[in-house]
């Protein structure tokens, strides 16, 4: 059994393909999937998918609800209430995707911090874990998280791609680490491959971030280059190789960690 903690199933690339994608995921041993909310509308779409496919795929889909740093300029006084209402749905297991992204600054750093801090407050009020994004903003994000750490119930750094120093800084805050197909990339993933063994197994979770970040150790690569949850096993395989631990151990431990972190059935 595997759990994919981050899938963008409401993405247009999956339109009219959701049932097939979920069927292939089950065939590949992926029994639970957490859909990522990145805006109010995408969070609603994620929750709607959980409802739509509950009868056909019982207790397989869950969701996060939040506003991604790219969308932070959409934050207003109604956003908090909207996310709180969405978070009351039984399938919602975390607040996010939230955090800071100073790589592209599609929203200004100030706008990002306002939305981030508000979602930290929401997670504290609801005592729900955080699903965090961070790109080229580790120092500021760590400062904010350190300030709020005592009130945060739990948090996972989704799609970690940072260096060893940043990894240890997050681990020092007792945060969890999500690993995607980035680790399978023979060009961009070399640093992550070297430090993956430094993540305690009980702090590690796996995710595809589908349809993005297709694992490059798939042979042959699918012609459409579209990632999906069924390919989670390739990420586990790569982690296994670089940690020098069996795929069975990686699968068992990451699943146990995700079940506990998200309080899944």
Region locations from a protein language model:
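Mid-domain alpha/beta scaffold segments of enzyme catalytic cores
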Residues: 1-265
């Amino acid at each position: 059994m595997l759990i994919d903690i981050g899938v963008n199933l409401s993405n247009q690339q999956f339109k009219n393909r959701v049932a097939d994608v979920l069927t292939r995921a089950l065939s590949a041993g992926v029994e639970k999937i957490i859909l990522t909310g990145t805006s109010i509308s995408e969070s609603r779409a994620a929750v709607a998918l959980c409802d739509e496919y509950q009868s056909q795929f019982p207790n397989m889909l869950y969701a996060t609800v939040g506003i991604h740093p790219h969308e932070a300029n959409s934050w207003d006084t109604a956003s908090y209430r909207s996310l709180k209402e969405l978070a009351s749905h039984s399938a919602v297991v975390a607040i996010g995707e939230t955090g800071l992204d100073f790589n592209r600054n599609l929203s200004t750093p100030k706008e990002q911090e306002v939305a981030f801090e508000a979602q930290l407050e929401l997670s504290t009020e609801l005592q729900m874990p955080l699903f965090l994004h961070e790109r080229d903003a580790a120092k500021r994000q760590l400062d904010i998280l350190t300030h709020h750490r005592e009130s945060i119930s739990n948090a996972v750094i989704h799609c970690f791609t940072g260096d060893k120093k940043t990894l240890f800084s997050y681990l020092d805050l007792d945060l969890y680490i999500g690993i995607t197909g980035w680790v399978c990339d023979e060009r961009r993933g070399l640093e992550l491959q070297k430090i993956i063994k430094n993540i305690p197994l009980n702090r590690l979770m796996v995710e595809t971030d589908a349809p993005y970040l297709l694992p490059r150790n798939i042979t042959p690569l699918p012609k459409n280059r579209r990632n999906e949850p069924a390919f989670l096993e390739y990420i586990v395989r790569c982690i296994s190789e670089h940690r020098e631990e069996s795929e069975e151990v990686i699968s068992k431990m990451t699943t146990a960690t995700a079940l506990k972190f998200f309080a899944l059935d």
